[in-house]
Curated annotation (Swiss-Prot):
GO cellular component term, pick one: extracellular space
Function comment: Acts as a ligand for C-C chemokine receptor CCR6. Signals through binding and activation of CCR6 and induces a strong chemotactic response and mobilization of intracellular calcium ions. The ligand-receptor pair CCL20-CCR6 is responsible for the chemotaxis of dendritic cells (DC), effector/memory T-cells and B-cells and plays an important role at skin and mucosal surfaces under homeostatic and inflammatory conditions, as well as in pathology, including cancer and autoimmune diseases. CCL20 acts as a chemotactic factor that attracts lymphocytes and, slightly, neutrophils, but not monocytes.
Keywords annotated in UniProt: Chemotaxis, Cytokine, Disulfide bond, Inflammatory response, Secreted, Signal
Signal peptide location: 1-26
Source organism of this protein record: Bos taurus
GO biological process: calcium-mediated signaling; cell chemotaxis; chemotaxis; immune response; inflammatory response; T cell migration; thymocyte migration
Compartment(s) of residence: Secreted
Protein known as: C-C motif chemokine 20
Length: 96
């Protein structure tokens, strides 16, 4: 009976440690925008975008544009040109 309790405790401890290390590795692999580009990007070089929200993982709100050359470029979602490009890309997707 004593051996069974020790095994159960060991299994519970190992589970907690495994969950702890898995959650740490996911957070450290997450890329966040730390600053915005100063350049205005032309929509013809862009293939898509995502939105980054400021939360416990990332410090700033951003629109992340993806280029044909597979680059990710962070832009300020408050800028007029960013809103226009997001609208254009959204319209492009709707037409597909």
């Amino acid at each position: 009976m004593m051996c069974s309790s020790k095994n159960l405790l060991l299994a519970a401890l190992m589970s907690v440690l495994l969950l702890h290390f898995c959650s740490k590795s996911e957070a450290s692999n997450f890329d966040c925008c730390l600053r915005y580009t100063e350049r205005i990007l032309h929509p013809s070089i862009l293939v898509g975008f995502t939105q980054q929200l400021a939360n416990e993982a990332c410090d700033i709100n951003a629109v992340v544009f993806y280029t044909r050359k597979k680059l990710a470029v962070c832009a300020d979602p408050k800028k007029k040109w960013v809103k226009q490009v997001v609208h254009m890309l959204s319209q492009r997707v709707k037409r597909m």
